[in-house]
């Protein structure tokens, strides 16, 4: 029996080949050479690339035996994940390969900025000795604010604490209990800005976080603060930061990332108080080596038919055929539970009832977590990293089964509990020969509406004319109602309406609707 073929298309460290083991046949190809790549992939069971080789639909179509594409790095811009998923090809990357390098680089920038090391170095190289011109500031005894407590943010917090600093943090998706476990005081962003002597930013770049540290935020910081951004370009307003340094409010800064890259012209480059590097956070030999060995291990597992860490798509995973159709619905239930919760829940419970309870359904717990975190995490949320994300943010998750399901052959309930004891419950089922997804319950109120598209959920005071006001305001804004269903509260004057719309609802229209019908709660959720 021939060994599976692993095709390496880009230059990788020798340790990568060693990590693949002796149960595969390793071949090499010049991946950027399109013709050579297309000629080599038909016999490949696995394809390993870095950033130089493009793996698109054409390459995938030419590789009928391909089971896994492994990107030795974090980004996946050169891999068509959707095309791979459509062909049942697993896609993996190495999301944790550079976290230590990135954390250390942030600390290097902070230290260099606090002691004016680059400016002092340049001065001495000009054959001048100006000790008095380069007085620095200690980290010991100071308050360091970490904005974003993901994997890298936590590493920075742990390491900076060793300097004798007091660490505070802002992250709306980390529970106070989890922060306490880390020995970190959790603050609002405004409080962190006001208290921190140093601020290090470690957030993903999303519409909500872009420009987070802007002119207004900088004005709230302590005089003499030092700011570091080694996360994503655009989180810090570079022009506003330059003005704050020039004006003397901000003492210094360190940046490894910029809103536009490559960046060779910035007002920050003219300031001696600013330390800049050209996006070097992951540029260490160890990070590159780790990326190769990480994906090699994923390839080894995939070819052995085992569960694969760091998978970024569903289609390549091995899931029971009775359970597979429920994955997307339960993900949507997780999204819905998260949106309806006032804050990130501290616990998530998935109950499987009816015939489906006879199957192995652990993957549905992961699917619900994927949905819960997908709206707040920039990187791909996978069946493997979802539990780690939950652990990092202090969210527990469980799954339970019950054979009884009076109204449906099978139904899945997702229950989210907040730190304040608030509870959100949502339920869904599959129906018909096409296994259409349906929402059947939200917070004890019964529905029968397809789980798809943009949905507006309003819990409001049920008075005559309320529905007309909602329809009029949406219509005036050019938003079409595709489907709607009303469920009245069992007791009291309240009702909940679920409307599926043809587009998102502008913020001002949401505000107007909430005021018009005395809404207790109004949320828009994308269930596409």
Swiss-Prot record:
Note, other: Was identified as a high-confidence drug target.
Catalytic residues identified in the record: 232, 261, 279
Keywords for this protein: Amino-acid biosynthesis, NAD, Oxidoreductase, Serine biosynthesis
Gene: serA
Catalytic activity: (2R)-3-phosphoglycerate + NAD(+) = 3-phosphooxypyruvate + NADH + H(+); (R)-2-hydroxyglutarate + NAD(+) = 2-oxoglutarate + NADH + H(+)
Reported function: Catalyzes the reversible oxidation of 3-phospho-D-glycerate to 3-phosphonooxypyruvate, the first step of the phosphorylated L-serine biosynthesis pathway. Also catalyzes the reversible oxidation of 2-hydroxyglutarate to 2-oxoglutarate.
Binding site for NAD(+): 151-152, 171, 230-232, 256, 279-282
Protein name (Swiss-Prot/TrEMBL): D-3-phosphoglycerate dehydrogenase
Keyword presence, Amino-acid biosynthesis: yes
Gene3D superfamilies: 3.30.70.260, D-3-phosphoglycerate dehydrogenase, domain 3 (3.30.1330.90), NAD(P)-binding Rossmann-like Domain (3.40.50.720)
Pathway: Amino-acid biosynthesis; L-serine biosynthesis; L-serine from 3-phospho-D-glycerate: step 1/3
NCBIfam families membership: PGDH
PANTHER family: D-ISOMER SPECIFIC 2-HYDROXYACID DEHYDROGENASE FAMILY PROTEIN (AFU_ORTHOLOGUE AFUA_6G10090) (PTHR42789:SF1)
The ACT domain, residue ranges: 455-527
InterPro entries assigned to the protein according to its UniProt record, in alphabetical order: ACT-like_dom_sf (IPR045865), ACT_dom (IPR002912), ASB_dom_sf (IPR029009), D-2-hydroxyacid_DH (IPR050857), D-isomer_2_OHA_DH_cat_dom (IPR006139), D-isomer_DH_CS (IPR029753), D-isomer_DH_CS1 (IPR029752), D-isomer_DH_NAD-bd (IPR006140)
Source organism superkingdom: Bacteria
Pfam families xrefs: 2-Hacid_dh, 2-Hacid_dh_C, ACT, PGDH_inter
GO cellular component, one term: plasma membrane
Protein species of origin: Mycobacterium tuberculosis (strain ATCC 25618 / H37Rv)
SUPFAM superfamilies with a match to the protein in the record: ACT-like, Formate/glycerate dehydrogenase catalytic domain-like, NAD(P)-binding Rossmann-fold domains, Serine metabolism enzymes domain
GO terms (BP aspect): L-serine biosynthetic process
Keyword hit for Isomerase: no
Protein family membership: Belongs to the D-isomer specific 2-hydroxyacid dehydrogenase family.
CDD domains for the chain: ACT_3PGDH-xct (cd04902), PGDH_4 (cd12173)
Example GO molecular function: phosphoglycerate dehydrogenase activity
Protein EC: 1.1.1.95, 1.1.1.399
